[in-house]
Regions:
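N-terminal Rossmann-like dinucleotide-binding module
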Residues: 28-92
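N-terminal secretory signal peptides and thylakoid transit peptides that target proteins
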Residues: 4-28
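A structured beta-alpha segment of the ubiquitous adenosine-cofactor-binding alpha/beta core
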Residues: 97-114, 118
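C-terminal helical cap and adjacent loop that interface with cofactors, partners, or active-site loops
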Residues: 24-29, 60, 243-256, 270, ...
């Protein structure tokens, strides 16, 4: 089963081939401006967009869509009416197209949108994505795509159906859009790295509020509190470390055979069940070693480090890419001095928004971001489970178990 899972990277209709990666990279590198000139805004067809999840990042990315100039923010949905209304006021969305409660996304889908942007806690992504694709819409979604294996498989099925129906499905990762990362990865793929021995990834980000739980999980659905809850957000490793894991897969291009690791909860007064300190080793069938280290706390790290990055140690070269800091390919036949990755959180989203518009309006039916988004999610789930069990877990075992995580939605407004 593992060999089949690895092979599908090169067989799936929505898996990125090398040619597609280069084309996507060129498109991302050209999408560098926040807003289109007025003349270009008038020339480009507008996409009617619905945004599901209008809290911090949802409202923020909705503004980026609006600033692009060729999106009409047509409808909004959020569990909390005050959140939907605040975003609606800021974005000029008619009050009749602001929806709330758990089922608000259904009304948004029926409101006449062409596409949806999904920005809720990841627990809800599979259900929302499936409904959007079934309705014939294009999908733009945040990461991680799910919190468990069944959710990942549901996203895989939805993306496959989107491809069949000639619709776009884009998962918003930022590291692959940076010009320095793109060039360094292309050189490495073209023989510039040599024989890869070890991959080292890390994530040294902060924590999110983790207050005492209330009678229902309603209080966990805002202010990123859900990052502390494995069922709602996947936990810190799946939700955050996935940036670095996804970055590594951009070059490695295959999933591990197994993972082992140790993790614990180190934050003060925790109420969610997510661990926040991780040391993980991934084993690959060809002998490749990949280690990952993470601390989800509010302390410092070395001045030369960036909070999220990935290093590739090969013979003869060394490659570093990341969410910030200096990207470099050192040694080997295709050395690259690279440069500092700047403002990637916003710049990467802006590039992806531009790429999504281009794909939708040109009927490109592009779904090439999906394969690595699913495999990076499965890889982080594999690591999370190995750490929780303090045992080695194989990729095949994880898929065979097909474990479902359930959040208690009782008492919530439906």
């Amino acid at each position: 089963m593992h060999d089949q899972s690895t092979a599908r990277l090169h067989q799936d209709p929505f898996a990125p081939s090398r040619r597609q990666f280069v084309a996507a990279a060129a498109a991302a590198a050209s999408a560098m401006t926040v807003a289109l000139p007025a003349s270009a805004q008038q020339a480009q067809p507008k996409i009617k967009l619905g945004v599901v999840g209008c809290g911090g990042r949802g409202a923020w990315i909705a503004r980026l869509f609006k600033n692009h100039g060729a999106y009409d923010i047509h409808a909004l949905a959020d569990y909390f009416p005050d959140v939907a209304n605040a975003a609606g006021d800021a974005l000029g969305v008619d009050k009749s197209r602001r929806f709330s409660s758990l089922s608000g996304y259904k009304k948004l889908i029926e409101s006449g949108v062409d596409a949806v942007a999904l920005e809720t806690p990841p627990y809800f992504f599979p259900e929302h994505a499936r409904a959007a694709v079934d309705a014939g819409l294009h999908v733009y979604m945040a990461k991680p795509v799910a919190v468990d294996v069944p959710g990942c498989l549901a996203i895989e099925a939805a993306a496959r159906k989107a491809a069949t129906n000639k619709k776009c499905f884009l998962v918003d990762y930022q590291i692959p859009t940076d010009p320095f990362n793109i060039e360094a990865l292309n050189r490495a793929r073209d023989g510039g790295l040599g024989r890869l021995f070890v991959v080292h990834s890390h994530y040294f980000g902060g924590q999110f509020p983790d207050p005492p739980k209330t009678a229902t999980i309603e209080s966990r659905l805002r202010f990123l509190t859900w990052c502390n809850d494995v069922a709602l957000g996947g936990g810190y490793h799946v939700n955050a470390c996935i940036h670095s894991i996804h970055g590594g897969l951009l070059l490695v291009g295959k999933t591990p055979a197994a993972a082992t690791g140790f993790s614990s909860i180190r934050r003060d007064n925790p109420h969610g069940d997510s661990h926040d300190a991780f040391s993980i080793s991934f084993q690959f069938a060809d002998g490749l070693v990949w280690n990952h280290l993470a601390r989800h706390g509010n302390g410092l790290f070395a001045p030369e480090q960036v909070f999220s990055g990935c290093e590739f140690l090969a013979d003869p070269a060394f490659l570093r890419i990341g969410y910030g800091g200096r990207t470099i390919l050192r040694g080997g036949p295709k050395q690259y001095a690279g440069g500092d990755v700047q403002n990637l959180y916003e710049a990467g989203a802006v590039r992806n928004i531009a790429t999504f518009h281009k794909n939708v309006t040109e009927a490109a039916a592009d779904t090439t971001t999906v394969r690595l988004a699913i495999d990076s999610c499965l890889m982080t789930i594999l690591a999370r489970e190995a750490c929780l069990r303090a045992d080695k877990i194989t990729w095949d075992q994880l898929l065979k178990e097909n474990k479902t995580l359930s959040a208690d939605l009782s008492g919530l407004k439906t």
